């Protein structure tokens, strides 16, 4: 019946309570046969391995002495108290404890459960825990209470499960309330969209995104559900806390068949809604402080991406679905609760792994949804808001990084004037650098008349070479030969003029009158 890696403490506890109910003098032998058909004790003891059930089976071995029967009953009760009211009891174990329709009588709990001495005959010696292995034919090994206590501490999943034991002491001992809680558990565990161990933010989002048809149709399957459960389940107040959801989802695949079979055996009348829902409110002070108990509004479901497998969507043309959506709108006033739900939606989007929207874009879309309930004009409003924001983004982006392909119609004149200034300035600089050697050539041509400046003009490896080479363009070979030939012609004319003047002087002529006539 059970898989091998399942909880051993759950098997032990269930086997104890089956045996305790058969040993009670109520005459419920039919229930015993039903339990033996459902859960044979051989398979339970063989599946458990190192941790077998710790109580002997009274069906297999009935002791002839009446005091030993009382002792085994008292021993079972002490072990029951030790298991049921321990600090770290599993919540699935508590649910199965209270399913079996018996209440634990008020008896003193013993710390060492298996070492209690019998009370009726005073001359009987103290029974040791190791002797109980000789009673059963299966030779079941017993463990000391300290080892069981350490094993239970290892099996506990989280410290938040400690509050469930106090629950079972005060209010959860009634089988009627637990029957309704098992029904509620079967309703919640039948969802296929819940993962095995989700983070708390994802659990909240998935419970928010539950479709309204799914929630409203599930309580109608059971005929004995009173009508006030529909409103409580539909509004989704935090009646079932976060850690109980995760623990129920973890053990839903293993213990669903067990719980449903036990639930069919127990035909009890349903209790009121206060017995069922007020206990989790009073026992879970640390459940979720930021989660408000407002009913789910449709605007909080608007932008979540988990709309893939759901049947009811915003644009569904079915008239029944539209009527249900409008009824959900009419139940609570919209303008008061839209702001709270928007805040909750932003918190959840920041906490979980979801796409974050711009707050202005988010608020505008929410108000367009909440102002017009199911009118066909809402997608038009939504599209216009989206397109206007897109246009603004397009007009802002070229001002930051202008491109050459953008037309000046979409861009302001001031944003494109600065790059043109820079381009003209760079062109002016390049023109000056190209025109820079021209004044150097002009200065060289103006210095041709003087004799001294010609010899100094193009000389390498001097202090003034940097200015001449870097500012102007270096002369080519043809220009050098041309300048050399011009220099040689000037030298020849100068020498000829000097020789003519010497000849005139040697002949006794007037040189100054000749220069005045020639010049």
Curated annotation (Swiss-Prot):
Residues 155-165, 301-315, 389-400 have a biased composition (Polar residues). GO terms for biological process: conidium formation; sporulation resulting in formation of a cellular spore. The keyword Transcription applies. InterPro entries: WetA. Keywords: Activator, Conidiation, Sporulation, Transcription, Transcription regulation. Residues 419-428 have a biased composition (Basic residues). Induction: A huge increase in expression is observed between the fourth and fifth day for solid and liquid cultures. Residues 108-118, 435-452 have a biased composition (Low complexity). Residues 105-165, 270-294, 301-320, 325-344, 389-452, 470-495 are annotated as: Disordered. Coiled coil: none annotated. BrlA, abaA and wetA are pivotal regulators of conidiophore development and conidium maturation. They act individually and together to regulate their own expression and that of numerous other sporulation-specific genes. Belongs to the wetA family. This is Developmental regulatory protein wetA. The lineage of its organism: Eukaryota, Fungi, Dikarya, Ascomycota, Pezizomycotina. The gene is wetA.
């Amino acid at each position: 019946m059970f898989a091998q890696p399942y909880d051993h403490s759950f098997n032990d506890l269930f086997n104890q309570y089956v045996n305790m109910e058969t040993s009670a003098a109520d005459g419920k032998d039919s229930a015993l046969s039903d339990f033996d058909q459902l859960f044979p004790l051989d398979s339970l003891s063989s599946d458990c391995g190192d941790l077998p059930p710790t109580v002997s089976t009274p069906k297999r071995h009935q002791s002839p002495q009446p005091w030993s029967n009382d002792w085994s009953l008292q021993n079972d009760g002490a072990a029951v108290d030790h298991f049921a009211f321990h600090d770290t009891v599993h919540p699935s174990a508590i649910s199965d404890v209270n399913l079996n329709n018996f209440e634990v009588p008020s008896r003193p709990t013993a710390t060492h459960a298996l070492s209690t001495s019998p009370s009726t005959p005073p001359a009987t010696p103290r029974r040791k825990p190791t002797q109980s292995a000789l009673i059963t034919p299966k030779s079941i090994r017993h463990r000391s209470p300290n080892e069981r206590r350490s094993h239970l501490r290892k099996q506990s999943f989280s410290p938040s499960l400690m509050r469930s034991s106090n629950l079972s002491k005060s209010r959860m001992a009634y089988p009627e309330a637990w029957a309704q809680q098992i029904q509620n558990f079967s309703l919640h565990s039948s969802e296929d969209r819940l993962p095995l161990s989700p983070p708390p933010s994802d659990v909240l989002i998935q419970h928010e995104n539950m479709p309204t048809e799914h929630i409203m149709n599930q309580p109608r399957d059971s005929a004995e559900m009173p009508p006030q459960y529909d409103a409580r389940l539909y509004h989704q107040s935090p009646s079932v806390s976060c850690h109980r959801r995760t623990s129920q989802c973890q053990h839903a695949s293993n213990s669903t068949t067990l719980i449903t079979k036990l639930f069919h055996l127990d035909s009890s009348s349903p209790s009121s809604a206060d017995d069922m829902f007020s206990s989790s409110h009073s026992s879970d002070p640390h459940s979720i402080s930021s989660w408000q108990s407002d009913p789910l509004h449709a605007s909080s479901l608007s932008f979540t991406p988990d709309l893939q497998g759901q049947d009811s969507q915003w644009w569904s043309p079915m008239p029944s679905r539209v009527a249900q959506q409008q009824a959900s709108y009419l139940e609570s006033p919209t303008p008061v609760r839209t702001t709270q739900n928007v805040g909750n939606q932003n918190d959840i989007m920041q906490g979980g792994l979801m796409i974050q929207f711009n707050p202005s874009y988010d608020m505008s879309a929410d108000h367009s949804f909440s102002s017009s309930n199911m009118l066909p004009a809402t997608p038009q409003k939504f599209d216009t808001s989206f397109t206007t924001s897109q246009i603004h983004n397009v007009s802002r982006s070229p001002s930051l990084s202008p491109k050459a392909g953008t037309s000046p119609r979409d861009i302001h004149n001031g944003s494109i004037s600065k790059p043109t200034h820079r381009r003209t300035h760079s062109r002016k600089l390049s023109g000056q650098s190209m025109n820079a050697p021209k004044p150097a050539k002009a200065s060289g041509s103006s210095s041709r008349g003087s004799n001294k400046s010609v010899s100094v003009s193009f000389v390498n490896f001097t202090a003034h070479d940097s200015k001449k080479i870097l500012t102007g363009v270096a002369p080519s070979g043809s220009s050098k030969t041309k300048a050399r030939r011009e220099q040689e012609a000037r030298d020849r004319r100068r020498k000829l003029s000097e020789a003519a003047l010497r000849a005139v002087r040697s002949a006794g002529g007037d040189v100054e009158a000749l220069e005045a006539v020639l010049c």
